[in-house]
Amino acid sequence: MPCATHYYSGHADNWFLQLGAGINSPFFEYSDVNGSKKHHLTAVYDVAFGKWFTPYFATRMNFMGGTLHWDNATYHKMNYVAGSVDFMWDMFNGLGGVNTDRVFSIVPFAGLGAAYAWNMQPAGNIAGGKTRHKSTTWAPDISAGLQLRFRLSRYVDFFAEGRVQFLGDVFNGTAYGVPVDLNISAIGGFTINLSLI
């Protein structure tokens, strides 16, 4: 009987670097002083380093950051960075078979990590000592998303991906209302296949 094809990745094979930028919008407890709800879009920057262990499965260390703006009776803003370990699955290779000449792939992913925010203006409602409210905060980060990957050459891919981050309620410095804070981002950029350089 014919044997199934097995794919192996050496220690130096299939590493990649991703550089991207896009927009994000927080879904916190939000409304302006009149009760109307409006989302603010701000820039987000992204860098990731990872490895494809098989044609189907990869992991990456992903770092993203920027500013977040939202209304909570008054205008709020803060700076943030987030890091996560993402687990990626090439859906086309997994369902349609491996094709090294494929020019388009869909890659769902899920991640675990943490996010840190600082320069929160105005400060939230969480006490930080000496009668002051905290202007920095952090929260665990569970995320999920979908990446569209377009092959430009053996060395470079273009990608566009959307990500939803599920953060603890205290991430925006305000502990009431919805128990989970969300941040939604859309990012585009380039993947450099380091093992081919």
Segments and roles (model prediction):
Residues 1-50, 119:
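Short glycine/proline- and aromatic-enriched beta-strand/turn motifs that initiate or cap beta-hairpins
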Residues 3-14, 56, 92-106, 152-155, ...:
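Short loop/turn motifs that connect adjacent beta-strands in outer-membrane beta-barrel proteins
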Residues 29-37, 63-80, 118-140, 172-178:
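Flexible, solvent-exposed loop segments that connect beta-strands
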Residues 55-126:
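Gram-negative (and chloroplast) outer-membrane scaffold detector with strong preference
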Residues 59-60, 73-74, 78-80, 151-197:
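Predominantly the C-terminal beta-signal and adjacent terminal strand-loop region
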Residues 100-102, 107-157, 162-163:
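Extended, charged alpha-helical interaction scaffolds
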